[in-house]
């Protein structure tokens, strides 16, 4: 984040995260100065605040950002690529060694956000999980609720 701010890039942040990120950007890095500490326009971030659906770009690579707003995912958002029905689910999807969900509640909250947004998802991926069919994830959520 500090590098992006130093370069003057727009940074899309969830509204709830702004106070934390403002402090992070304002923090001095004098012992080992980073790019933000060295730049002349430091501490002036180009925040793009996400508090609801936010569209970025156009055409087949257009993205839509949606806050998750769950009990465990309140500070995360998902990224949807409508042309390919592809969903990036942030840091919510990870499988155990047995193929089950590491934390079913996280994916349950993503499924709720997908329903609220009324989007059609075919494939989902996340920080710790490669692409997999959305139908498979829904089945894993359902299975975890029966246990």
Question: Where would I find each of the regions flagged by the language model?
Answer:
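Metallo-beta-lactamase
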Residues: 5-7, 16-144
């Amino acid at each position: 984040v500090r590098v992006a701010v130093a370069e003057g890039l727009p940074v899309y942040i969830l509204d709830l995260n702004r106070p934390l990120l403002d402090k992070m950007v304002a923090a001095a890095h004098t012992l080992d100065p980073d790019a933000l500490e060295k730049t002349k326009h430091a501490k002036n971030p180009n925040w793009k605040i996400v508090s609801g659906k936010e569209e970025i770009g156009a055409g087949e690579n257009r993205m839509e950002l949606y806050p998750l707003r769950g009990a465990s995912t309140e500070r995360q958002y998902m990224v949807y690529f409508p042309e390919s029905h592809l969903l990036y689910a942030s840091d919510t999807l990870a499988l155990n060694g047995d193929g089950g969900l590491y934390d079913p509640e996280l994916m349950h909250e993503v499924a709720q956000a997908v329903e609220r947004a009324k989007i059609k998802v075919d494939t989902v991926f996340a920080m710790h999980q490669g692409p997999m069919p959305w139908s498979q994830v829904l089945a894993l959520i359902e299975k975890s609720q029966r246990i």
